[in-house]
Every structure is written in structure tokens, then in C-alpha cells.
UniProtKB/Swiss-Prot annotation:
One Gene Ontology molecular-function label: serine-type endopeptidase activity
Natural source organism: Nomascus leucogenys (Northern white-cheeked gibbon)
CC annotations in GO: axon; extracellular region; plasma membrane
Glycosylation (residues): 26, 683
PROSITE patterns: KRINGLE_1 (PS00021), KRINGLE_2 (PS50070), SRCR_1 (PS00420), SRCR_2 (PS50287), TRYPSIN_DOM (PS50240), TRYPSIN_HIS (PS00134), TRYPSIN_SER (PS00135)
Name of this chain's protein: Neurotrypsin
Site entry: Reactive bond homolog: 630-631
Lineage, broadest ranks: Eukaryota, Metazoa, Chordata, Craniata, Vertebrata
Length: 875
């Protein structure tokens, strides 16, 4: 302790009467460690709870003490990084750190003006420098090389301690350069961070000024998760913006807990040499290269209106931000709506300016816009796979080019589809687009990079689509892909060329109509759906033949949203988008009303005379069939794929009979079904009709025909209280062999031989019908492959109910639930004989539940009744 400090401490009463002078001297000479810093508020001399002890005798004479060793503080880490050399202050910390106000063990310093007796008793050489100063920064007024200050100790008395000049030092870590990064503060020998709560540009500007990195600072945030284990020192920093050091700002000492948003304070600094350019930032983007353009003017952030906003303006913004690559303008608050004022409007840059300030524009604050028109930019770095449209009138149209290995190249149009166009336009920021003629744009002279591109429509980037290897193609530049993209209109109205596809049809020319809107495939409701609407869909897909509309989920129910309802086409429109008069997503429909189309439709109803001779002698012939498709466990069949499938319908007073049972056509005039189908409504022929050539129960079709019943013959051994002899024959109305007209969709099945055992002679068995699908009764004809089982399975399961006049069929495993249920009673169990003829071996009769594990279905064995069938039908 120096003499001056000892005198001051004595005058202030810091040395109690009970402590001998020699002990104080010895403590000072041996540099006894100071007390721990007090935990409460600090006041000069004493804490408020203590009384100053009465002085009973004058202080003893003060000997001369050796001065503390001169120790220069270490250089600031940030100064070394930035290339600065700290200038020593003549009587304190270096010039860059004159604001330290705590001791090296963390005790807050007292204000110099609060210890006036020091001046009066033993003024040091530099005391005049501190006269009237109410600050508490560490100084060395007695000429010692190491700054110090007074502090209140744990007992409420005044003591002194050395200071660490690095306390409160600032550095930026983790940035791309020295002008940006996470703010770190040095305290108590450890670097720590600042919680980002209330962190703003005023705080950031003080940091930048303190680091001599310019007077402009932009507040940023960094996740704590990427900083490792590091303490937090401050929160709620509240700078005015003109402070010379962050230590001069109001702030809260971190007391623990959770920092809001778990973000640390960070800054980006910039100089203001040359012309005064406005501060710009990009907000709301997925990276630092894109976002809503915001300007800092008159002390607040604001946006730019997108009137006249184009790629030339974006070029200037990217240049001003130091971002290279492809500059693109974005409109209509693409990166979200901002807040605060709209700063600028009608910006009209040429693209060569250094700052938006140099571009023609409105006066600051003058505009006629809302935040729905906030402008944005993207400054996409030139990396492999970046795409652009070149040679057009703007960035929305032109020749498709891809950047690869430092060079732009084109894409060949082999196999190009609307889905490819959609992915390209979406990546470029547009909602829709269409392929344009390459003749509209100048031919490229660069390489052809890609060929045979195929997108599904779900890709977010063009390079996610399947394609050939880079540079492999068999094209010329006359086959370059050209595209015109369109933004989404107001209220989500569609522009031209949104993707359309047909699903679940028998071929690519038919199916359920689905459209791709707002990133999702969805369906169209069939309200008002006509052949004119179908014609537009088919034309959009490139088909020129006749088109037919299909309603009532003819091709099965879709999934996802129902995008469109009440389509009104005249038949001459270029695309479905021209027919849509109602807002997207607005409807009153279910997927049971999904619309469909058949393109290049050339179906024609067959003539009875023309088919009589060629088809009357043929049975079991499937003219229309395709790959196997698996009622319960089944899927839609092919139209006309099971031409002997008919339905027994119960007539009603309205004339539209409902499905009662399935049945099998044996000839033009005879149908085979189950006897139990007549158990409830009796055997009066007036109650029933038979429909042949049907596929969708609610949609009339060209091969469909409904015929009255002339005779019902139930096997004489059938009893309503039994399941045995469950077989019946139905005679259709009409002349002999001229009841039903044969066609590719209406043909008879073959009968088996008497006592034929299908397990040995047949394979590839199916059940068909409109029955239970596991969710509801189907509107479209279903089919399901089903294995024949040894009779012992049903004998064990059903005991005495199963007889030798029955067949056992079905899957025993729960995960392969295939069965023929209530709506398919009387329907056929068909198996294929070698030679491709199909034989009706079973009639759906009964079972336990529907698709229940270990409960196979039971079918009437037709081969046991062949003599009876022939005697009745005379076949």
C-alpha cells in the first residue's frame, strides 16, 4: 500500500481502533489477499447498516512505502486480430480500455469524487485529473504502472485493489471476417457471452466503435448451441448508440436462468467511408443470401415497395451487401410481410449503381403501398446446379440453363413434361409455368448439360429429378428447353399451365383428374363436370381424340385436398385454368365426387346381331385383362375384365334399383346366383332386374344394359334355414339367345365338368363384385385373387355346416385379408383353366364375418350341380 492510499484509508476510517498500526503495515507489505467483493449495493466508507466508529486519537505518522510493481496489461485479443496496437494511457489502462471499473477480483469500484479526503490529506501528482470526476474507472493517480481503485469491502469499509485492464474487453468470434461474429466479453479471467434479449443496432454500433471497426453496427443473433460451454455475463444491454465503450451502457448482470430464444448477441460492422449509403439487411430468408429488403433510415428499419422492382434493383442490393451470384427480385412479400414504415417506392436502378441510394426512386417515406408489396431479393451463389432462364424479356422466361463447372449450359427437351416445368418454376420462385417454343429465344452456343430429365413434381430443386449424367445427350440446341413461368395471382387464382395428371386409369389416357397446386396434388369435384371439361383436360395433356367425362369417383377416390369445384369449360380453352371461376380450395364435396376423364375415347356399343354368331359359342373368354390386381383385400378391376359379372338388382318405385347380389352370366338368357339372394324379397320376378356390362354402379356406360327377369329357379333342396344347396338360376326376358347382347364387355362364363375338382385342375382363382372393401361398399367392380383351400380347413372351422357341395377358399393369415362379403353374395368364384378359358367353380355363399383370420369363405361348388343347371337351362 502506498503512503497516499494508507493516509486516505486512515482518514476514511478504514482502519479500526483495535487494529495496531504495525499489523496494518505488515498486511500491506505482505500483500494480504483482499476480501471477497460485497454482494449488496456499495456506498463510500460504510454500508448503510453500519455506523462510522468515533475517532479517539489522531492517525500515526505515515512511513514511505514501496510502490506496487509496475505491470503493463496484456494486449487486447481483438486488437491483435484487427491489427491495432493499444496505446498506453499515461496514468491508467490502455487508451482502448479506459472504462474498466472493477478490481481484478470482481469488486465494483467506488467513484473517485466520493473519496474527497484523499485530495486534502495527500494529493497525488495526477489527482487534478480526477477532481470533480464522478466516474469509477480504474486509474493510477499516484503514478504506479498498474491501475487501481477504491472499493467497499465485505465489512462495509473502504479498501483498494488493482484492476485487470482486460476486464470488459470485447472480441468477435465465429464470423466470416473480422467485421462480424458473436460478441464475447472478458471478465474475471474468462471470456463469456451476452444474452441477446433487447439486443439492437444501437448496442451493436457501440461494439463496432469500441473495436474500431466502423461506426455502424447491425445486431445479429447466434444460437448458444454452437458456442460450447461458455458463461453468460450480461443481458438486457441498453446502449444509446453514442457510448465509447460497452461498459458505459446500462445492462443487467446475468443472474442465471434461461436466455430468451437461447440466442447470444452478435454484430456485423461496416465503415462509412465515401458516400453515405443506407444500411441494408435481408430478413425472413432461409439463408443470409436472401430475404425481405429492409433499410435503416432516421433511426428505424423499414421496407421497400415492389413497384418497378426488378432484377436490376436486386443486383444493386446484392452488390451493396457484398453478395455475389445471381441477383433476383422477389415481389408481393415473398419473404413475409415486414413491419414499420415503407421507406422507398418506385426504385428504378440500372444495375450498375454501388448503392440503392444512387438509384432513381421516390423520396424517403413517400409511397402508395402496404406491406403485402414488400420487395425482396436473393443473391444466389454460383454453385453447380444453379438454374436460370436466359434470353427472354425477364427472369420469368427464356431458355433453361444450368450452371456446372464454371459454365452455363442448356437442357435437352427429350421426355420433358409439365411436372419438370413446374419444378423449375417453383425453384425460381414462381407458382406455375408452361413450356415455351425454343424459337422465341436466341439459340445457345454453350454446352448441353442435361438430357432425359424426369420430375415427379414433389422435388424442391431441379437437380433432384432423375436425369442422365452431366454432358451426356443426343440433342442439338434446337431441342433446348424453354420455359415461361407465371406468379400466382390474387386470391390464389391460377395462371396457365399448372400440372395435371390422370390417376388409377387402365392406361395413361384415362383416370382421376388431379392437379398440383400450392405444393400438393389434389382432385376436382364433379359438380357440373361434363365432356367439355374433359376435352380441355385431354387437350392440355396432348390428346386430340374424343373425350368423355366420368363422375362419382369413377376411377376411385383420391387423397389430399379437393382443389377445384364448379369447373365451367366451353371446350375450346387451352387449359383447365381458363375454366376455373371459383377460388382454389373452395368446395362442398367429398372424394366420392372426384372427377375423371377418358381421352381418345372410341368406345361403341356392340350390336346384338354382329356379335351373335362370333361370340355365342364362346365362353370363359376375357378380351380385356391386364396384370393381376389383388371386395376385402381387392382393387378396382379392369373395365370389361370380367364380362360374365352381372348384378341382381332389387327394383324400386323410383326405377333405380339397388344392388342386391352378384351373379354370373352363363348364356345370353341365363344367370347363375345364390338361392339365399331371394330369401328376403321372395321369388316374384317383378321385384328384380339384372344388369350386365356394368362397372361403376352410379355411372351409365355404353356396354351396360338392364334386363328384366322372366323366371327364377331355386334348387328344390334349398332350405332358408340352411346354407346347403345355395344355388339358383335366373332367366332373363327376351327371345331365345337374344336376351343380353354380347360384346367385349358382356360374355358368358364356362361351366365346370360334373364333379370336377378345381383344386387339381384349376389355378389362378379370383372373386369379383361390388361388395365390402373393408371401409364401405364399392361403386366400382372389384377383384381379388384368392386361393382354394383343402376342405378340411372349413370342416374344422365350421364343423357340420360344411358339406361336400361346398368349396373352401380364402387366406388364413390376418395380413392377407381376402374375402367375398355381403354385397357379393351370389357372385362368381372364377378360376383359369389351362388354355385361358375361365370357369365358374363357385358361387359366393356364406362365411364367418368378413375377412376374419382363420375364417375362410364358403362357396357353392358348381361342379356338383352341373346336371341340374343343364337340365334347367338346356345348355
Amino acid at each position: 500500500m502506498t503512503l497516499a492510499r494508507f493516509v486516505l484509508a486512515l482518514v476514511l476510517g478504514a482502519l479500526p481502533e483495535v487494529v495496531x498500526f504495525d499489523s496494518v503495515l505488515n498486511d500491506s507489505l505482505h500483500h494480504r489477499p483482499r476480501h471477497s467483493p460485497p454482494t449488496g449495493p456499495h456506498y463510500p466508507y460504510y454500508l448503510p447498516t453500519q455506523q462510522r466508529p468515533p475517532r479517539t486519537r489522531p492517525p500515526p505518522p505515515l512511513p514511505r512505502f514501496p510502490r506496487p510493481p509496475r505491470a503493463l496489461p496484456a494486449q487486447r485479443p481483438h486488437a491483435l486480430q484487427a491489427g491495432h496496437t493499444p496505446r498506453p494511457h499515461p496514468w491508467g489502462c490502455p487508451a482502448g480500455e479506459p472504462w474498466v471499473s472493477v478490481t481484478d477480483f470482481g469488486a465494483p469500484c467506488l467513484r473517485w469524487a466520493e473519496v474527497p479526503p484523499f485530495l486534502e490529506r495527500s494529493p497525488p501528482a495526477n489527482w487534478a485529473q480526477l477532481r470533480g470526476q464522478r466516474h469509477n474507472f480504474c486509474r493510477s493517480p499516484d503514478g504506479a504502472g498498474r491501475p487501481w481503485c477504491f472499493y467497499g469491502d465485505a465489512r462495509g469499509k473502504v479498501d483498494w485493489g488493482y484492476c485487470d485492464c482486460r476486464h470488459g474487453s470485447i472480441r468477435l468470434r465465429g464470423g466470416k471476417n473480422e467485421f462480424e461474429g458473436t460478441v464475447e466479453v472478458y471478465a474475471s479471467g474468462v471470456w463469456g457471452t451476452v444474452c441477446s434479449s433487447h439486443w439492437d443496432d444501437s448496442d451493436a454500433s457501440v461494439i463496432c466503435h469500441q473495436l474500431q471497426l466502423g461506426g455502424k453496427g447491425i445486431a445479429k443473433q447466434t444460437p448458444f448451441s454452437g458456442l460450447g460451454l461458455i458463461p453468460i455475463y450480461w443481458s438486457n444491454v441498453r446502449c444509446r448508440g453514442d457510448e465509447e465503450n460497452i461498459l458505459l451502457c446500462e445492462k443487467d448482470i446475468w443472474q442465471g436462468g434461461v436466455c430468451p430464444q437461447k440466442m447470444a448477441a452478435a454484430v456485423t460492422c461496416s465503415f462509412s467511408h465515401g458516400p453515405t449509403f443506407p444500411i441494408i439487411r435481408l430478413v425472413g430468408g432461409s439463408s443470409v443470401h436472401e430475404g425481405r429488403v429492409e433499410l435503416y433510415h432516421a433511426g428505424q428499419w423499414g421496407t421497400v415497395c415492389d413497384d418497378q422492382w426488378d432484377d436490376a434493383d436486386a443486383e444493386v442490393i446484392c452488390r451493396q451487401l457484398g453478395l455475389s451470384g445471381i441477383a433476383k427480385a422477389w415481389h408481393q412479400a415473398y419473404f413475409g410481410e415486414g413491419s414499420g414504415p415503407v421507406m422507398l417506392d418506385e426504385v428504378r436502378c440500372t444495375g450498375n449503381e454501388l448503392s440503392i441510394e444512387q438509384c432513381p426512386k421516390s423520396s424517403w417515406g413517400e409511397h402508395n403501398c402496404g406491406h403485402k408489396e414488400d420487395a425482396g431479393v436473393s443473391c444466389t451463389p454460383l454453385t453447380d446446379g444453379v438454374i436460370r432462364l436466359a434470353g427472354g424479356k425477364g427472369s420469368h422466361e427464356g431458355r433453361l440453363e444450368v450452371y456446372y463447372r464454371g459454365q452455363w449450359g442448356t437442357v435437352c427437351d427429350d421426355g420433358w413434361t409439365e411436372l419438370n416445368t413446374y419444378v423449375v418454376c417453383r425453384q425460381l420462385g414462381f407458382k406455375y409455368g408452361k413450356q415455351a417454343s425454343a424459337n422465341h429465344f436466341e439459340e445457345s452456343t454453350g454446352p448441353i448439360w442435361l438430357d432425359d430429365v424426369s420430375c415427379s413434381g414433389k422435388e424442391t430443386r431441379f437437380l433432384q429429378c432423375s436425369r442422365r449424367q452431366w454432358g451426356r445427350h443426343d440433342c442439338s440446341h434446337r431441342e433446348d428447353v424453354s420455359i415461361a413461368c407465371y406468379p400466382g395471382g390474387e386470391g390464389h387464382r391460377l395462371s396457365l399451365g399448372f400440372p395435371v395428371r390422370l390417376m388409377d386409369g387402365e392406361n395413361k389416357k384415362e383416370g382421376r383428374v388431379e392437379v398440383f397446386i400450392n405444393g400438393q396434388w389434389g382432385t376436382i369435384c364433379d359438380d357440373g363436370w361434363t365432356d367439355k371439361d374433359a376435352a380441355v383436360i385431354c387437350r392440355q395433356l396432348g390428346y386430340k381424340g374424343p373425350a368423355r367425362a366420368r363422375t362419382m369417383a369413377y376411377f376411385g377416390e383420391g387423397k389430399g385436398p379437393i382443389h377445384v369445384d364448379n369447373v365451367k369449360c366451353t371446350g375450346n380453352e387451352r387449359s383447365l385454368a381458363d375454366c376455373i371461376k371459383q377460388d382454389i380450395g373452395r368446395h362442398n364435396c367429398r372424394h366420392s365426387e372426384d372427377a375423371g376423364v377418358i381421352c381418345d375415347y372410341f368406345g361403341k356399343k356392340a350390336s346384338g346381331n354382329s356379335n351373335k354368331e362370333s361370340l355365342s359359342s364362346v365362353c370363359g373368354l376375357r378380351l380385356l385383362h391386364r396384370r393381376q390386381k389383388r371386395i376385402i383385400g381387392g382393387k378396382n378391376s379392369l373395365r370389361g375384365g370380367w364380362p360374365w359379372q352381372v348384378s341382381l338388382r332389387l327394383k324400386s318405385s323410383h326405377g333405380d334399383g339397388r344392388l342386391l347380389c352378384g351373379a354370373t352370366l352363363l348364356s345370353s338368357c341365363w344367370v347363375l346366383t345364390a338361392a339365399h339372394c331371394f330369401k328376403r324379397y321372395g321369388n316374384s320376378t317383378r321385384n328384380y332386374a339384372v344388369r350386365v356390362g356394368d362397372y361403376h354402379t352410379l355411372v351409365p356406360e355404353e356396354f351396360e344394359e338392364e334386363i328384366g327377369v322372366q323366371q327364377i329357379v331355386i334348387h328344390r333342396e334349398y332350405r332358408p334355414d340352411s346354407s346347403d344347396y345355395d344355388i339358383a338360376l335366373v332367366r332373363l326376358q327376351g327371345p331365345e339367345e337374344q336376351c343380353a347382347r354380347f360384346s367385349s364387355h358382356v360374355l358368358p362364363a364356362c361351366l365346370p365338368l360334373w364333379r370336377e375338382r378345381p383344386q387339381k385342375t384349376a389355378s389362378n382363382c379370383y372373386i369379383t363384385g361390388w361388395g365390402d372393401t373393408g371401409r364401405a361398399y364399392s361403386r366400382t367392380l372389384q377383384q381379388a385373387a384368392i386361393p382354394l383351400l383343402p376342405k378340411r380347413f372349413c370342416e374344422e372351422r365350421y364343423k357340420g355346416r360344411f358339406t361336400g357341395r361346398m368349396l373352401c377358399a380364402g387366406n388364413l393369415h390376418e395380413h392377407k385379408r381376402v374375402d367375398s362379403c355381403q354385397g357379393d353374395s351370389g357372385g362368381p368364384l372364377m378360376c383359369e383353366r389351362p388354355g385361358e378359358s375361365w370357369v365358374v367353380y363357385g358361387v359366393t355363399s356364406w362365411g364367418h364375418g368378413c375377412g376374419v383370420k382363420d375364417s375362410p369363405g364358403v362357396y357353392t361348388k358348381v361342379s356338383a350341380f352341373v346336371p341340374w343347371i343343364k337340365s334347367v337351362t338346356k345348355l
